[in-house]
Amino acid sequence: MNTIFDILPQENRETLHKKDQPDWTVPMLATLTDKRFSKENWIYERKLDGERCLAFKKGQEVRLMSRNRKKKNHQYPEIEKGLKGQEHDFIIDGEIVAFDGNVTSFSKLQPRMHSKDPDMEVEVFYYVFDIIYLNGHDLSSLSLKNRKTLLKKAVHFRHDNIR
């Protein structure tokens, strides 16, 4: 039987563990350093100035959660809508941002973060950078590179606000 996990090398598939989807998971946080570094297998990503958001999708239910465990569905209904139609159950991690020109702007996002009427506010985008859980499997044993491979396969970035 073919599964989405077949794109991983066999030794990585063997490390996956079946697990019920948790109600919460602590997001990994970046560590600031003054030292310059470079390693062949390291991944460098652009720093986005927005609101960290974990998305929990199970069936047709989507919960958008801040890193402080605050539900954000009401503030970002277009993100919720873009994730509802996805095929797989998952927990993904990303950043919700607003733009001022070509640059992400936290100050432009702030009114939207506390809005009671998000339809009247600025357009937002969800930049997804990690997948933590997929279809009944905890992915924490996988490298970030392998998780990103699964992320590209599991999440269809066809909705304009999901990137």
Task: Mark where each language-model region is.
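Catalytic cores of nucleic-acid ligases and guanylyltransferases
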Residues: 1-163
